[in-house]
């Protein structure tokens, strides 16, 4: 659903539609933050995360050094962007995501938690599921807080109260 796609992109990769697999602005920001000792922030795009998911499914070397892994992710992400449409990348990403440890993909997660297909999720439910990604085992309260924090920069009419209610309903 458009609400789900919007929620996922607002939390995971705001410039998804505009970059070619790597968001160099985010990469530069993360490097700058690391150099001055600020808190770590991620710079992986959805395409890079998908590249990582695909590589880890095939690679026996799960402990590849961090910088080497990132370079590999960049290469694979660029290849994905050359051969797949943005829609195909987003669909594969949503189908491979791990939610709450035991669930793979948005379809299974939506069915189990909301008892409906992803296309039937409303905006609040979509925001809650998107907020599960950084920490799938977080409490409903923490997930609602994360989803509310993401509202600040979004273009939605949702209120924090609506999100908290959806989190309580889906995750309790």
Give the location of each predicted region:
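Acidic helix-start/capping segments at beta-turn-to-alpha-helix junctions
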Residues: 1-5, 19-37, 43-48, 71, ...
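Short, functionally critical alpha-helical segments immediately adjacent to catalytic or ligand/cofactor-binding
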Residues: 2-33, 90-97, 126-132
């Amino acid at each position: 659903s458009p609400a789900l796609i919007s929620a996922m992109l607002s939390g995971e990769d705001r410039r998804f539609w505009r970059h070619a697999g790597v968001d160099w602005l985010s990469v530069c920001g993360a490097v700058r933050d690391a150099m001055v000792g600020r808190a770590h922030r991620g710079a992986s795009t959805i395409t890079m995360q998908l590249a990582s998911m695909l590589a880890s499914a095939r690679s026996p070397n799960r402990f590849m050094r961090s910088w080497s892994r990132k370079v590999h992710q960049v290469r694979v992400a660029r290849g994905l962007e050359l051969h797949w449409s943005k829609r195909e990348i987003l669909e594969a990403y949503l189908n491979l995501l791990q939610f709450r440890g035991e669930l793979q993909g948005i379809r299974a997660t939506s069915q189990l938690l909301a008892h409906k297909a992803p296309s039937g999720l409303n905006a609040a439910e979509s925001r809650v599921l998107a907020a599960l990604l950084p920490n799938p085992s977080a409490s409903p309260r923490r997930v609602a807080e994360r989803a509310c924090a993401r509202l600040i920069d979004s273009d939605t009419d949702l209120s924090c109260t609506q999100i908290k209610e959806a989190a309580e309903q889906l995750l309790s």
